[in-house]
Amino acid sequence: GEQARAALSRVIAQDAPIVLLDEPTASLDIAHQELVLGLAGSLARAGGAVVIVLHDLDAAATHADHVVMLVDGQVAAAGTPAEVMTSEILSRVYGHPIDVIDHPVTGRRLVVPSRSRRD
């Protein structure tokens, strides 16, 4: 986690117009994940281009302006999170049922794998 935060700090200090981040939140707790993704959003709103590789579909649905889903190195879907992050598309891409629901209070899109408890 500390290495990821230090690397992100170096990227910000360089004031690069394009930022490429590969799984920047993978080793972070939830609070730091939100901090990093919020910071990336701030960089984008300030005019920078930010490309982030994420496997956390819920975080991508929340923070991304545009999503590109790859399967075997080929683009399987591209568009806004609302266009791309649907149960149908995600389930096809991942080969596993995925639920996409709207939060009952905030309306924010929630992406979770369908799971059944095995007793």
Residue ranges and their predicted role:
Residues V19-E23:
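Catalytic Walker B motif of ABC-type/P-loop ATPase nucleotide-binding domains
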Residues Q33-A46:
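Helical segment within the ABC ATPase nucleotide-binding domain
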Residues A60-T62:
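A short, surface-exposed alpha-helical micro-motif characterized by mixed small hydrophobic
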Residues V93-D119:
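ABC ATPase nucleotide-binding domains
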